[in-house]
Structure formats: C-alpha cells, structure tokens
Amino acid sequence: MVGPGLYPEIGKKARDLLYRDYQTDHKFTLTTYTSNGVAITATSTKKADLIFGEIQSQIKNKNITVDVKANSDSNVVTTVTVDELTPGLKSILSFAVPDQRSGKFELQYSHDYAGVSASIGLTASPVVNLSSVFGTKALAVGADVSLDTATGNLTKYNAGLSFSNDDLIASLNLNNKGDSLTASYYHIVNHSATAVGAELTHSFSSNENSLTFGTQHTLDPLTVVKARFNNSGKASALLQHEWRPKSVWTISAEVDTKAIDKSSKVGIAVALKP
C-alpha cells in the first residue's frame, strides 16, 4: 500500500544513509533454519573487552510471527505480530522477562492517506502513545505524543513534516517536547548510484547546533561504500559487500580529526545466512 507511512519513517531515509551499519564494535551473526521453518539467529558482539551474546528464534505461521530473543544479561523478550487483521492493520504484543513492566500492546494502521500507531503499556498505570501521519507519499505531516496515565503528564510530544519526490526526500522534525528542531535531506544525484544526505539539529535550550553530512555510492549490485563527517570533527567510512546471497560483511572506521594522534576505531560485522 502506497501512503505516507508511520511516524518513525519521517526522515528515516537520511538517518539510514548517515548512521545505519556504522559501528566500532566487532559483531558476528549466524542464521540457520530448522526443518519445520523456524529461523534461529545467534549474535555475538565484542565491545572493548566485553562480549555480549544474543540468540533469537522466529516462527512464522501464515500472518502470525513470533520472535523470542534471549541475551547474555538474562533478559528474554517475546514479540507476537499479527499482520493484516484487516487490510492495513497490524497488531504487536511484546513483553520481557524479568521486567514485569515491559509489556506493551500496539496497533498500526496504514492507509493511502494516513498512518496511525497506538500503543499502551500492560501495567496498572500505563504509558499511552499515539502517533499519526496524514498526507501522501509526496507530502505528509505527523505528530507523536505519549501520556503517562499515572501522573497525567505528557512525556513526549513531537511533530514532523516530510516532502519527497523521485530523487529527493526532505523532512523537518520538532523533538524533545519542542526543545530541538531537526532538518534532514536525502538526494539521489542525477538518478545515479550515488546519494547524499545531511542532518542539522538545533537545540533551543542550549543554543547549540549539530551537523552531520554524508554520501553513499553503490559500486555494483553487491557492494556499497559510505562516508560521513560531523561538526565535532569525526569522520567515518564504511565498505559493505554481499559475498553470497543474504550473507554480508561490513568494515567501518571512525577517526577524530581534532585528535588525529589518537588511534582510530574500526568495526567489523559479518552476517551469515544459508
């Protein structure tokens, strides 16, 4: 269904170009499938001298998907998703063990001219979240609001505006209860394999600005290179290659140009799927 999408999709294309797949850790992911179709994914991540592990199992039956994740911190998160309850409607139930206050139920509805999401925490005094986007794929406006029913206070209220055409997506977001304004831009250069993007954020309370800009180029259908730079002087680069179907390795590096004598950070990620 073609429409404006849900609220988190405002500015997502620029965020993906600037931040997605960049990392300074070492990460290995292996996915296997059992004979009855259950997908099992094991992930190991090394951060400094610490190693974190996670194992995920996913079961799909028609329009129902069940995800169970367990990590090395002894947390178990279960998510049950039911697609197309009616055309355009999705329901999501999630809860974690041992966190008894983590339960949440969410409904998402996508239409040609609207995208609405409503969620409620499964507690005695839950937090209720409502986000909506109205418009078309070319021009849309949206809002995202959370209410703490225990105090009656709004814990979050954001607003966003998005404009897009065949090769350009621009967005404007008012975040942090109106304290920060973010403008983002994504552009495919001359309908080529190269895209550029930028994100500028202004904080009204501190009167500070942050700017990140970057580019992405598809060398061939299996290889992508990316680079970015921000106003704090940090430069990053990334090379990603799909060396076999669904199996990808990624190498990324970051250097602080204001402290060039310090060692740069290098991250490696390998994801294997049969």
Swiss-Prot record:
GO MF entry, a single one: porin activity
Keywords: Ion transport, Membrane, Mitochondrion, Mitochondrion outer membrane, Porin, Transmembrane, Transmembrane beta strand, Transport
Main location: mitochondrion
Residue spans crossing the bilayer: none
Alphabetized Gene3D superfamilies for the sequence: Porin
Assigned GO CC terms: mitochondrial outer membrane; pore complex
Induction (UniProt): Not induced by osmotic stress.
Domain of life (superkingdom): Eukaryota
Tissues in which the protein is found: Expressed in shoots and roots. Also expressed in callus, leaves, panicles, sheaths and stems.
Zinc-finger recorded as keyword: no
Entry's localization field: Mitochondrion outer membrane
Family assignment from sequence similarity: Belongs to the eukaryotic mitochondrial porin (TC 1.B.8.1) family.
Domains as described in the record: Consists mainly of membrane-spanning sided beta-sheets.
Function, as annotated: Forms a channel through the mitochondrial outer membrane that allows diffusion of small hydrophilic molecules. The channel adopts an open conformation at low or zero membrane potential and a closed conformation at potentials above 30-40 mV. The open state has a weak anion selectivity whereas the closed state is cation-selective.
Record-given protein name: Mitochondrial outer membrane protein porin 1
Organism: Oryza sativa subsp. japonica (Rice)
Gene assigned in the entry: VDAC1
